[in-house]
């Protein structure tokens, strides 16, 4: 399993970091088999798996439940678990308690915290307590309503300068890596060059130190409409739907189960079932 130090080395050597967001045992297992460097158990599970229209409904219990499953599926991969909405905002004490729960109860190696500014003291507290932190800036889904919806961030000079200040503060607070979501590729390149910690982009161009996409988006699995920054590498929905339809057709036509998928008993044993009558 890689460590935080390994990711810094990868950045310095120009080796791209592959992160996949996965939410359960089978998806995490496949991500590990595919060679992902990091698995993110994201609070986007609220949208993708639980059917919510926002991540704000995701609870600590949800994150722990899914984090445990992902860890069982990928025991040899570095796992980052999201701190869900309001789990690290009310007080430093709450932040530490919730961060400790995520690490202890899921087996994750790190937590991810959205935002800068008022979150900086919380990041510092987590790091001081021995909990590795990934920061998340740009489009931060938990506060999308405040940002004016799901749209590209840092497009004008003032916003870009503020983001440059924010990422430096996150690094100084002790974050070992940074997720950059939905920002101009030029800004992402500038940030990646400026920081000593690795950057992982999602909708941030090719010049970040790594990339992250959601398992379901990569495979077109249960996805209604993917964002512009998503590239699908397979169509699982199409394949799975055909499999389910074929199953239903064979049940109705009595072609399933056939002899290959059924069990039998010896003829003499069958006779005893009927009291010896043949």
Curated annotation (Swiss-Prot):
Cofactor binding: number and manner: Binds 1 Mg(2+) ion per subunit.
Major place of residence: cytoplasm
Cofactor: Mg(2+)
InterPro entries: Pantoate_hydroxy_MeTrfase (IPR003700), Pyrv/PenolPyrv_kinase-like_dom (IPR015813), Pyrv_kinase-like_dom_sf (IPR040442)
A GO cellular-component term linked to this record: cytoplasm
Stored CDD domains: KPHMT-like (cd06557)
Pathway given in the UniProt record: Cofactor biosynthesis; (R)-pantothenate biosynthesis; (R)-pantoate from 3-methyl-2-oxobutanoate: step 1/2
Gene Ontology MF, one: 3-methyl-2-oxobutanoate hydroxymethyltransferase activity
Subcellular location: Cytoplasm
The organism's place on the tree of life at top rank: Bacteria
The protein's Enzyme Commission number: 2.1.2.11
Binding site for Mg(2+): 43, 82, 114
Binding site for 3-methyl-2-oxobutanoate: 43-44, 82, 112
Signal peptide limits: none
UniProt keywords, alphabetically: Cytoplasm, Magnesium, Metal-binding, Pantothenate biosynthesis, Transferase
Catalysed transformations (reactions): 3-methyl-2-oxobutanoate + (6R)-5,10-methylene-5,6,7,8-tetrahydrofolate + H2O = 2-dehydropantoate + (6S)-5,6,7,8-tetrahydrofolate
GO terms, biological process: pantothenate biosynthetic process
Location of the active site: 181 (proton acceptor)
Subunit structure of this chain's protein: Homodecamer; pentamer of dimers.
Similarity remark: Belongs to the PanB family.
Function: Catalyzes the reversible reaction in which hydroxymethyl group from 5,10-methylenetetrahydrofolate is transferred onto alpha-ketoisovalerate to form ketopantoate.
Protein name: 3-methyl-2-oxobutanoate hydroxymethyltransferase
Annotated organism of origin: Desulfitobacterium hafniense (strain DSM 10664 / DCB-2)
